[in-house]
Amino acid sequence: MKTHVEVSSARRKQRKAHFASPSHLRQTLMSAHLSKDLRSKYNVRSMPVRKDDEVLIVRGKFKGNKGKVTQVYRKKWAIHVEKISKNKLNGAPYQIPLSASQLVLTKLKLDKSRQSLLTRKAASLKTKGQKHTVA
């Protein structure tokens, strides 16, 4: 249901906006769910996937495999995971691109900015549904 007059709900426009989105917006669009352990620890459901995160593949041909993220290729919407590869006819290996929706984050690479993002997301989820005004 459309709620805002100036925002389009047309499917073709939403698809165009999604596939033509710039790199800094693709980062948040390429988010994956956290594992149950991390979700209970940080009180956050999902995070953008980043290089050196450890992931579990939960969908597709490589379901059940674990590995470390070696590359997040935003332009192609692809995430490359260590040891998830095939060989070409000449024997050279190439990495299989995965979607963020196929992955669950099991271990995060934390630094200052990522830690602050986790605390901000947890705080906003805690106040969700409450009034923001102070009486």
Curated annotation (Swiss-Prot):
<dbReference type="InterPro" id="IPR014722">
    <property type="entry name" value="Rib_uL2_dom2"/>
</dbReference>
<dbReference type="Pfam" id="PF16906">
    <property type="entry name" value="Ribosomal_L26"/>
</dbReference>
<dbReference type="GO" id="GO:0015934">
    <property type="term" value="C:large ribosomal subunit"/>
</dbReference>
<dbReference type="Pfam" id="PF00467">
    <property type="entry name" value="KOW"/>
</dbReference>
<keyword id="KW-0687">Ribonucleoprotein</keyword>
<keyword id="KW-0689">Ribosomal protein</keyword>
<dbReference type="GO" id="GO:0003723">
    <property type="term" value="F:RNA binding"/>
</dbReference>
<feature type="region of interest" description="Disordered">
    <location>
        <begin position="1"/>
        <end position="23"/>
    </location>
</feature>
<dbReference type="InterPro" id="IPR005825">
    <property type="entry name" value="Ribosomal_uL24_CS"/>
</dbReference>
<comment type="similarity">
    <text>Belongs to the universal ribosomal protein uL24 family.</text>
</comment>
<dbReference type="GO" id="GO:0003735">
    <property type="term" value="F:structural constituent of ribosome"/>
</dbReference>
<dbReference type="InterPro" id="IPR008991">
    <property type="entry name" value="Translation_prot_SH3-like_sf"/>
</dbReference>
<dbReference type="GO" id="GO:0006412">
    <property type="term" value="P:translation"/>
</dbReference>
<protein>
    <recommendedName>
        <fullName>Large ribosomal subunit protein uL24</fullName>
    </recommendedName>
</protein>
<dbReference type="InterPro" id="IPR005756">
    <property type="entry name" value="Ribosomal_uL24_euk/arc"/>
</dbReference>
<dbReference type="InterPro" id="IPR041988">
    <property type="entry name" value="Ribosomal_uL24_KOW"/>
</dbReference>
<dbReference type="InterPro" id="IPR005824">
    <property type="entry name" value="KOW"/>
</dbReference>
